[in-house]
A protein has these predicted regions:
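Short, low-complexity, charge-dense intrinsically disordered segments
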Residues: 1-27, 35-50
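N-terminal hydrophobic alpha-helix used for membrane targeting or insertion
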Residues: 5-8, 21, 31, 65, ...
């Protein structure tokens, strides 16, 4: 089964593949992820999903933090008097838009690449991403002298594609509407002997992402609530593990776009739901579903899931650009939008909000702000 030649830089759906449940290499091991409806998780007995994988713990996050200490930025925590007055709370923004490559993704990417064997590092890695994980893997690979190949949708923001190439990665574009990225990535990995580092469903990725919340909770003691955006659930699950370990009474709420609400539905029904190619400006949240690792972690550690509208995302972007003077992308403001738009109402509370990234095309921002 070969969907394309090794050096072909465009892709179309392989007609030989008539299903989506392929084996995917995760850190050198093969498993069979579920991309379909109907995966039920029993929270009380931990049956099914979690038993097949390494269960990520706070110890893993602490280990990742030590490995990242001199590599990743310890990003700033910002406050706003206007936001505090508007919400009648103390709000603390953890600004991962100031992280290397412009998003939290660098934390997990570097941590995951460090764990590879010498042979895996020599052969190289491959991943699929809408842009932020792509840049993170590309930079981490460059720093560690590991060849990187990135499968990116052709509608990903230009700034993300350009930066990924700039970090030295080979970029392969595909059409979201015609190609299953997991299948394309798997085929390339098999042809070239590469190790797949998925964008969220990987224990070392989750552990690395959790270091952002670890820093926030350690810096701002006594948080009552932590708001985190959710795409595939890597940042959300890692953040929840860290928050519950350091501040057990802190509630953790994940936030998605209304148009990409697979995780919210999965959380409330305890059944894994899929939304393919959701039409949302939050490109980092266009993942079809939570993963086999992140789904049970979200169920175990997260207290609630909510959604925000496209209009709320744009208004929040504008507000943060105008008042905090920071560049933020649509996905990056999901958590903030839930608070500022009143989806979450927690007066007299200490609230942490993770701003996940700031990689956005200026032309896109101009169009969004003008149209709103």
């Amino acid at each position: 089964m070969n969907c394309l030649k090794k050096n072909e830089h465009s892709a179309r759906r392989c007609t030989q593949i008539n299903h989506r449940c392929l084996s995917v290499c995760i850190g050198g091991r093969f498993s069979k992820p579920n991309f379909c409806h109907g995966l039920v998780y029993n929270r009380s007995t931990h049956t099914g999903v979690m038993s097949q994988f390494h269960s990520v713990t706070f110890v893993d996050i602490e280990t990742a933090a030590k490995l990242l200490a001199d590599i990743a930025h310890r990003t700033p925590v910002m406050t706003s008097t206007t936001v505090n007055q508007h919400t009648n709370s103390q709000v603390f923004f953890k600004c991962e838009n100031f992280q290397r490559t412009g998003s939290f993704k660098f934390r997990g990417a570097y941590n995951a690449l460090l764990q590879l064997s010498a042979d895996q590092k020599q052969k190289g890695v491959i991943t699929f991403s809408s842009g932020n994980h792509a840049q993170a893997i590309a930079l981490a690979g460059s720093l560690l002298n590991i060849p990187t190949t990135i499968v990116i949708p052709d509608d990903a923001p230009t700034v993300k594609r350009s930066a990924t190439r700039g970090y030295g990665a080979e970029v392969i574009l595909y059409d979201r509407s015609e190609t299953y990225r997991e299948e394309l990535t798997q085929t390339l990995a098999q042809d070239r002997g590469l190790t797949i580092i998925p964008p969220y469903d990987h224990p070392h990725i989750v552990a690395g992402q959790g270091t952002a919340a670890k820093e926030l909770v350690e810096e701002v003691s006594g948080l009552d609530l932590l708001l985190v955006c959710c795409g595939g659930g890597g940042l959300l699950s890692g953040s929840a593990i860290a928050a519950k370990a350091l501040s057990p009474n802190c509630k953790v709420i994940g936030v998605e776009p209304e148009r990409a609400d697979d995780a919210t539905r999965s959380f409330h029904t305890k059944t894994l739901h899929t939304v393919n190619n959701p039409d949302t400006i939050a490109d980092g949240a266009r993942t079809p579903s939570l993963g086999k690792i992140t789904f049970p972690l979200v169920l175990n550690y997260v207290d609630d899931m909510v959604t925000v509208s496209e209009e709320a995302i744009v208004r929040t972007m504008f507000f943060l650009w105008e008042r905090l003077k920071i560049v933020v992308e649509p996905t990056g403001v999901l958590a903030a939008a839930a608070l500022l738009e009143g989806v979450i109402n927690e007066p007299d509370a200490k609230i942490g909000v993770i701003i996940s990234g700031g990689n956005v095309d200026l032309s896109q921002v101009a169009q969004l702000f003008t149209s709103s």
